[in-house]
């Protein structure tokens, strides 16, 4: 008999954002987009900033922004350990736009005190937040 659902836990250092049975999970891994469904092969990978699209057992969807982290897939359990995780509805578009602008300014600064890698990571997180906001506004 085929598995119809898998248990998912999404946690950050601050809180547990989701725990329950799901039909599928779409998430951004270090090598690209991943689709996790019941019966998926075991997997351990790092996550890039982006969206976790959860399709619950009843077919409804929930979207969570992840700043990065780790994904572990086992036969009956999927665990997302996020650096920072925020429900899409709680994201602030204006704050994300401002963070994007600050990161771009830092990347364009020519001073010796500019850490390009930090600025690039900040830009990636801000852009990922904006993509999550845009994707969820299309769903609603």
From Swiss-Prot:
The keyword Ribosomal protein is assigned to this record: no
Recorded GO CC terms: plasma membrane; proton-transporting ATP synthase complex
Topological relation to the membrane, as annotated: Peripheral membrane protein
Molecular function GO terms recorded: ATP binding; proton-transporting ATP synthase activity, rotational mechanism
Compartments reported by the entry: Cell inner membrane
Function, in words: Produces ATP from ADP in the presence of a proton gradient across the membrane.
Protein name per the record: ATP synthase epsilon chain
The species this protein was found in: Colwellia maris
Gene encoding the protein: atpC
